Each structure stands twice: as structure tokens, then as C-alpha cells.
Regions:
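Conserved small-residue motifs centered on glycine
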Residues: 424-554
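Helix-loop-helix "hinge/cap" segment bordering the ligand-binding cleft or interdomain interface
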Residues: 170-173, 196-271, 292-344, 401-438, ...
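Short, solvent-exposed loop/beta-turn-alpha elements that line the ligand-binding surface or hinge
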Residues: 82-86, 168-185, 230, 281-307, ...
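C-terminal motif of bacterial Sec signal peptides marking the signal peptidase cleavage site
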Residues: 31-35
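Short, Lys/Arg-enriched N-terminal segments with co-localized hydrophobic residues
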Residues: 1-11
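Bacterial N-terminal signal peptides that target proteins for export
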Residues: 12-23
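Ligand-binding "clamshell"
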Residues: 158-170, 198, 361-388
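Conserved N-terminal structural module of periplasmic/extracytoplasmic solute-binding proteins
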Residues: 3, 36-237, 300-304, 519-599
Length: 599
């Protein structure tokens, strides 16, 4: 899945968010013994309850204190484990997405642990990755839908703002109901507001460092050595390297790629455009939004009408003319490209775009080929531009937990989900709730991926095979950057070894991409946050959006391949976009963006 922040005050909001998450995380892991772990829960609870009773003895009965604590009272579960069980145990129906590596949520070990801890029983309804949206929409439309929805995001503009099936949470977001959540996101609640200014869902974070620099290009260094050339750093040098490669390997592919959306950042245009202007797209989409950015004056613009975009197309056409770009780059799937990459004797591939090399080459079955590829930093273009897209809004997402009007006790539902925002909520749901068996905190003498003292060590790793001990990727991820980078890692791990992928991607992102982000380079354009439109706004531009994207994508291929002459066809291309309603599309985006800023 992809993750988006919903507010535009980039510098201040992002700084505040990172500070809040870092402070929350640091405080949480300093506790050391408060949250989950089946062997220690009762001991921790009894000790803390006794302390609470002693402190409150002068004014109230200890049972009253315990009751207050179990409804929140502003004290987080990390601070006081007597927050659970909840005061009003409930049974809720819930819809979420199933995953093939989790056998049965109803009988899952973590499900049982969470039910015993909180006193809340969940009756699950699920849909697969392929059909959850259709299944959930049918339920919401029929009137037969669950109390809560989590781990998937329905159309909040339609089912929340317009129809009221999903209820606003503003009145329920209190220290009594969700103290852990507010500890982490209290200053960022605006990021989850919909077009009417109300909050219909909870935020979550999965701050994957290398995912924010996902427009990576992998180049085969063995071929560079054979050609006697260095890693190219400019568009001119890249052109020369491609030409020399094709002279030596006439059947080779100098610059591979896939149809947009087939892989994870696997179309070469995303990476190569940064030599001319910012590519402002987002993951997993192929619509006009991919070519929409905001300038320093706060104006929404379409980069596909910029003269620098025309220069980009001209450069791509020059690569196409020498065979560096081939027709398959625009049509093939990720699996087809994977087949090409893994058959170098038939079709040697010099460069291939992808967020991670592991999507193409398996380090275990093909270690030699795996080690031949290294990341290629963005190239410096003719005017000195050298950019990579920093997906700054990919770390935090709204739409992670919602309550419907069927739910008779929203407060208790929020108290239940608040566990996921506690210091060990992510560890327990991802890897299991047995501290000392599934994970340990603050492992002595070990360091994290960032070189700092490790915050935790995973003992029961992620499994792609069916299991029923934990939820793995199901549900709500609460993983700030410091938390992800704080996982214990062997400092001497071979980045190209079976256990070195995270190290490889982290180093590549930090060294070859982060220095060239739009923020670091003070670029004139920036990426947009997710546009939180009303249902009417979305409907009004839906046809325009499809038509504009079609013109941009089809014309891009035509100009690059020479099927359409760039100089003689450029004005006609711009005219086609105007006739398709590009100005109306940008006006709608502008209105939504301005509204979001004012909230």
C-alpha cells in the first residue's frame, strides 16, 4: 500500500511530525517493561495498579482509580497498564484485508492476546488484496456493514462526508479514549481532516526511509568495467555509456523499463525526468495527478506542459534513436523485465529502474548477478538540474481506522485500537506478543540500521509462508523512521548478502538520492499531498482526469519514439490538453489545495 500526508505546510509540519514521533518513540522505549508479552503482563499490571492505588488512597478507593484508568483518564497504556481491560468490554464486527501469510485472524495468537488484554472481542470480516474494495463497497451500499473498518481505506468523501455511514471522530478523540494516539499525533490531527473539516479516520505511520527515495536506477558495474568507463554523472555521459554498451552488445538493453504502474517505480521516465525538472508523481497511480506539482507561489501546475518537460522528451528521443530505449520499455510487465534481466547471455541489461533490486534478482538463487548492480544517482542535466523525487508525504497516512454508525460504543472502539499506538503495539502485531521470544528491547551492544544503539531486536522474523502467530502486515502500522531504523542490524552485514537488503537500500538512498531531493536542491517545484476532495469534486473531474492522463501518456511515447515530431507536434499536444479540460482539472486541485491549507 501507499501512504500520504494531507497537509501542505511542508517545512513546519514535517519537522513537527518528526519531532513528535521521535519524542513519542524515545519515551516509549525508555519504559522497557510496560506493554505486551504474555509472561509479564499480569506482574506489570499488579505492580502498577498497587502504585496507583497507594497514590490515590487519600481521595478515592483503589477500585475507583482502576476504573478510571481503564477508561483512559489521560494516562497512556505505556504509563499505566491498568488502562486495559477497558471499562465496558464489547464485541465488535470489523472489516479488514486478509493476507495469504496469515491463516485465520479469528484464531490467531495475537488476536487472542489482544482480546485477553483489552476485553474487546473482534468478529472479523475480510477481503483479499484483490477483492476487498468491491466487497466492502457492496456492504456499505447494502446497509449490512460492520462496526469498524481498519487496515483498508474506503471512499471517505462518499461514505463519510456525504452519506454519514462512517462517523466523524472529532468528539471521541480524547485523552480518555486514545491517549497513545494523541501522544503521537496530537499536533497533526489536521492531516486527517476531510473536505468538510472533520476527522473520519485515524492516522498511522510506516516511515520507510528508502521508500521516500524510490525512483532508483540500477546499473550493471561489470559492463562499465568491461567498457572502461566510470559511473556516468551527466546526461551526456549517460548517452555515451549507452552508445558504447550497445556497440559491444548489439542485442543488449541499455535502459530497461516497464509500462507505468506495472512495477514499483519501474518506468525509466520517473528517474530520468529529474535531469530536467521534478517528476512529482506518487506510487501506484497512473493518472494526471502524477504530472501535477505545486510551485513556490503555491500555484498548482502541470509539469507535462513545461518547456523543460519538452527538453526531457527530446533527450529521451535521442536515446531511442541509438537504441538505448526500446519499445518494450513502454509495454512490458515487471515479470517480463525480470525474465530479461535474469538472462544476461540473451539480453544483457545495463540499466533497470526499480525501487529495490530484489524485485528483479534473487540474492540467494542468483547472487553473482545480484552483486553486479549498483544504484546510479540522478544525472546532471544540460542546465545543471539534478533531482530525485523525495516522496515526503509517503510516511504518514489517514484512512487507517474508521467507525461506522452501526457501532454502539465508539469510545471503547478507540480504546481498543489505541494499543497499536503504544510502544510495543507494532512489535506485537507484526512479530508476536511474547517478549523475549518474538523480540527484545534495547539489546545490549547492538546497533540499528542508522548506526545508533538498537531499540529492539527481532527474534521471530517476518514470514512469507502461512502462519498464525501474528498479524504480519494486516492492520495498522505504527512505525516511525527512528523505530524502523532502530532495529538491530549487524554493522558488518554484507549489503549484497541474503540479510543485507535493508542496508543496501538505506545506503543507496542516503548517498545517491537524498542529496538530490527537491528540498535539498531548493527546486522550484514540489510534490503535492493527497487531494482531499469532496464526492462532487471527484465526480466533476473524473472524466477529465482520465482523458488528460491518456493524452499525456500516449503523447509521451509518441514523442520519445519519434512517431510524432516533437517540434511540430508540441503546440497541438498542448491544445489537446486544453480541450480535454486541463485548466478545469488544475482549478479543482487548486481549490482543494487552498482549502486544505486553510483548515
Amino acid at each position: 500500500m501507499h501512504f500520504t500526508i494531507l497537509k501542505w505546510e511542508v517545512k513546519m509540519k514535517r519537522k513537527a511530525l518528526k519531532q513528535a514521533l521521535a519524542l513519542s518513540l524515545a519515551g516509549a522505549f525508555a519504559l522497557g517493561t510496560a506493554a505486551c508479552g504474555s509472561s509479564s503482563t499480569s506482574d506489570s499490571g499488579s505492580t502498577d495498579s498497587a502504585a496507583a492505588s497507594t497514590e490515590a488512597a487519600a481521595s478515592t478507593e483503589s477500585t475507583e482509580t482502576a476504573a478510571a484508568a481503564s477508561t483512559g483518564s489521560g494516562a497512556t497504556y505505556d504509563d499505566d497498564p491498568s488502562f486495559y481491560p477497558v471499562k465496558n468490554p464489547q464485541e465488535f464486527t470489523a472489516f479488514t484485508m486478509s493476507m495469504p501469510n496469515v491463516t485465520d485472524l479469528a484464531t490467531n495468537d495475537f488476536t487472542k492476546y489482544l482480546e485477553n488484554l483489552t476485553g474487546v472481542k473482534i468478529d472479523f470480516e475480510t477481503g483479499s488484496r484483490d477483492d476487498w474494495q468491491e466487497k466492502l463497497n457492496l456492504e456499505l451500499s447494502s446497509g449490512d456493514y460492520p462496526d469498524i473498518i481498519f487496515g483498508v481505506t474506503p471512499d471517505l468523501a462518499k461514505y463519510g462526508v456525504e452519506e454519514g455511514i462512517i462517523i466523524p471522530l472529532d468528539d471521541y478523540l480524547t485523552e480518555e479514549n486514545c491517549p497513545e494516539y494523541l501522544k503521537m499525533f496530537k499536533d497533526q490531527l489536521d492531516l486527517s481532516r476531510e473536505s468538510d473539516g472533520k476527522i473520519y479516520s485515524l492516522l498511522a505511520t510506516n516511515d520507510c526511509y528508502h521508500c521516500k527515495y524510490a525512483d532508483k536506477m540500477w546499473i550493471n558495474t561489470k559492463y562499465l568495467d568491461e567498457l572502461g568507463v566510470d559511473m556516468p554523472t551527466t546526461t551526456d555521459e549517460f548517452y555515451d555509456v549507452c552508445q558504447k554498451f550497445l556497440e559491444k552488445y548489439p542485442n543488449g538493453i541499455a535502459l530497461a523499463g516497464t509500462a507505468p504502474g506495472s512495477g514499483w517505480h519501474s518506468d525509466f521516465q520517473e528517474w530520468l525526468m529529474g535531469s530536467f525538472l521534478l517528476y512529482p508523481g506518487r506510487s501506484y497511480t497512473t493518472n494526471a495527478y502524477d504530472y501535477t506539482a505545486v510551485n513556490k507561489d503555491g500555484k498548482i501546475v502541470c509539469v507535462a506542459t513545461d518547456d523543460r518537460y519538452k527538453d526531457f522528451l527530446e533527450y529521451c528521443n535521442s536515446l531511442y534513436k541509438i537504441g538505448a530505449i526500446y519499445d518494450g520499455d513502454f509495454t512490458q510487465t515487471q515479470e517480463q523485465l525480470k525474465t530479461l534481466v535474469n538472462n544476461p547471455d540473451q539480453s544483457p541489461v545495463l540499466c533497470m529502474p526499480e525501487g529495490t533490486i530484489s524485485d528483479y534478482i534473487d540474492v540467494v538463487s542468483n547472487p553473482d548477478l545480484y552483486k553486479e548492480y549498483a544504484t546510479l544517482a540522478p544525472l546532471e542535466g544540460p542546465d545543471g538540474t539534478r533531482l530525485t523525487t523525495y516522496y515526503k508525504y509517503s510516511a504518514v497516512s489517514s484512512g487507517n481506522f474508521m467507525i461506522t454508525d452501526k457501532c454502539k460504543d465508539p469510545a471503547t472502539a478507540l480504546q481498543w485500537v489505541d494499543f497499536f499506538y503504544s510502544s510495543k503495539g507494532d512489535l506485537c502485531s507484526q512479530y508476536g506478543a511474547d517478549e523475549g521470544t518474538d523480540w527484545v528491547l534495547n539489546p545490549e551492544g547492538e546497533v540499528g540500521l542508522n548506526g545508533k544503539p538498537a531499540l529492539y531486536k527481532i527474534l521471530n522474523g517476518y514470514s512469507g509462508e502461512p502462519q498464525n502467530h501474528d498479524w504480519q502486515d494486516i492492520g495498522i502500522r505504527v512505525a516511525p523512521e527512528d523505530y524502523r531504523l532502530g532495529q538491530a542490524t549487524d554493522p558488518d552485514v554484507d549489503p549484497y548478502g541474503p540479510d543485507g537488503l535493508e542496508k543496501l537500500l538505506y545506503d543507496a538512498s542516503a548517498n545517491n538520492y537524498a542529496p538530490y531531493s527537491q528540498d535539498e536542491q531548493n527546486a522550484d517545484l514540489d510534490v503535492l499531498p493527497e487531494m482531499k476532495m469532496s464526492n462532487d469534486e471527484s465526480s466533476a473531474i473524473s472524466t477529465i482526469d482520465v482523458e488528460v492522463e491518456k493524452i499525456i501518456s500516449e503523447s509521451q511515447v509518441a514523442f520519445i519514439t519519434g512517431a510524432q515530431d516533437l517540434d511540430s507536434g508540441w503546440d497541438s499536444y498542448l491544445d489537446s490538453l486544453n480541450k480535454a479540460g486541463l485548466s478545469d482539472l488544475l482549478s479543482t486541485y487548486q481549490a482543494v489545495y487552498d482549502r486544505m491549507q486553510s483548515q
